[in-house]
């Protein structure tokens, strides 16, 4: 067995062990045991690795799918927990740094904005934005609105009304960004005419966790978004044990032209795919045997690896705010 195969096997074994430990937890709500296991999981998954999760055996694939579901549930509970903590402050937006992964959202949103500005024809100066799968902590919308798109209006969609109620409370004291944020409880499958109003649509990584679900969402967006509108899809090519992977060719088949694909090798966990709805691209047409167009990955320089800093920062904040929770 060569060194690369040994590395892959060692990682899969480690992830399998963590999955087994996480699956045995009585609850996925934030606690020292939950925090420690998921910190170990992120620590194992984020560094660059030769593993290709699409080529794993059936047993490992089943484990991975179960792990993604556990990650989704734990992420939802973690975000709800911190959303409630933040809502206790007079101005919650002043305390977003409490969340241990906030820096990841800052870096991911910056990357997405830079990719949009670089690759979307005509730019995105004053867009109407939809974020699908915004959750109880809509950090991405906030960072984009506050730092990159000061004139944009954001409509945030989530299936969970409780998540939207939590999210809206975070903006109650802010007269700028708060005035540009709206929250809607809806299934993306039920959005039709609404989608045509947006210049940019963001699709969160956990919308359509199963491959077949994601395969339904993207053609639906392609059928109802306006010509020329941009689509930002979060995937996880290099971190496929944490989030579902989206094939850029599936986006092409869904009625879009793929403009850029970026797989960061630093502390940004998600991959990013930038596409746009072209009047010459329709989901039901299949030029060259495909629906839509896929031009291949556009090389994007990733920022320098700050993985060690990220792990240290997350560990420090978890310890700091575990103690602080007594006050709430």
From Swiss-Prot:
Enzyme class name: transferase
GO biological-process terms attached to the record: nicotianamine biosynthetic process
Domain of life: Eukaryota
The enzyme's E.C. designation: 2.5.1.43
Annotated keywords: S-adenosyl-L-methionine, Transferase
Cross-referenced Gene3D superfamilies: Vaccinia Virus protein VP39
InterPro entries cross-referenced by the UniProt entry: Nicotian_synth, SAM-dependent_MTases_sf
Catalytic activity: 3 S-adenosyl-L-methionine = nicotianamine + 3 S-methyl-5'-thioadenosine + 3 H(+)
Pfam families assigned: NAS
GO molecular function annotation: nicotianamine synthase activity
PROSITE patterns on file: NAS (PS51142)
Family in the record: Belongs to the nicotianamine synthase (NAS)-like family.
Function: Synthesizes nicotianamine, a polyamine that is the first intermediate in the synthesis of the phytosiderophores of the mugineic acid type found in gramineae which serves as a sensor for the physiological iron status within the plant, and/or might be involved in the transport of iron.
PANTHER family from the UniProt entry: NICOTIANAMINE SYNTHASE, NICOTIANAMINE SYNTHASE 3
Protein name: Probable nicotianamine synthase 6
This protein's encoding gene: NAS6
């Amino acid at each position: 067995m060569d060194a690369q195969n040994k590395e892959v096997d060692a990682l899969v074994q480690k992830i399998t062990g963590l999955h087994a430990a996480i699956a045995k937890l009585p609850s996925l709500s934030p606690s020292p045991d939950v925090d420690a296991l998921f910190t170990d999981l992120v620590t194992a998954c984020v560094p660059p690795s030769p593993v290709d999760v699409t080529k794993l055996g059936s047993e490992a694939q089943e484990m991975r799918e179960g792990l993604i579901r556990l990650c989704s549930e734990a992420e939802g509970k973690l975000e709800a927990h911190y959303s409630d903590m933040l809502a206790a402050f007079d101005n919650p937006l002043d305390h977003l740094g409490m969340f241990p992964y906030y820096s990841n959202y800052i870096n991911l949103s910056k990357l997405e904005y830079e990719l949009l500005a670089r690759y979307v024809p005509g730019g995105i100066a004053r867009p109407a934005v939809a974020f699908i799968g915004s959750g109880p902590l809509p950090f991405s919308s906030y960072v984009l609105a506050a730092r990159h798109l000061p004139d944009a209006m954001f409509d945030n969609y989530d299936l969970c009304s409780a998540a939207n109620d939590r999210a809206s409370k975070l903006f109650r004291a802010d007269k700028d960004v708060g005035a540009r944020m709206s929250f809607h409880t809806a299934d993306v499958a039920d959005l039709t005419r609404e989608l045509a109003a947006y210049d940019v649509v963001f699709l969160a990584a956990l919308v359509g966790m199963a491959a077949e679900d994601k395969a339904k969402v993207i053609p639906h967006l392609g059928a109802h978004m306006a010509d020329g509108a941009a689509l930002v899809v979060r995937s996880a090519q290099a971190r496929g044990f944490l989030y579902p992977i989206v094939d850029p060719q599936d986006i092409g088949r869904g009625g879009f032209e793929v403009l850029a694909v970026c797989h960061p090798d630093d502390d940004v966990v998600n991959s990013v795919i930038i596409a746009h709805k072209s009047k010459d691209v329709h989901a039901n047409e299949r030029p060259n045997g495909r629906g839509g167009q896929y031009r291949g990955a556009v090389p994007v320089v990733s920022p320098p690896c700050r993985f060690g800093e990220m792990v240290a920062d997350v560990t420090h904040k978890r310890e700091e705010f575990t103690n602080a929770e007594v006050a709430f």
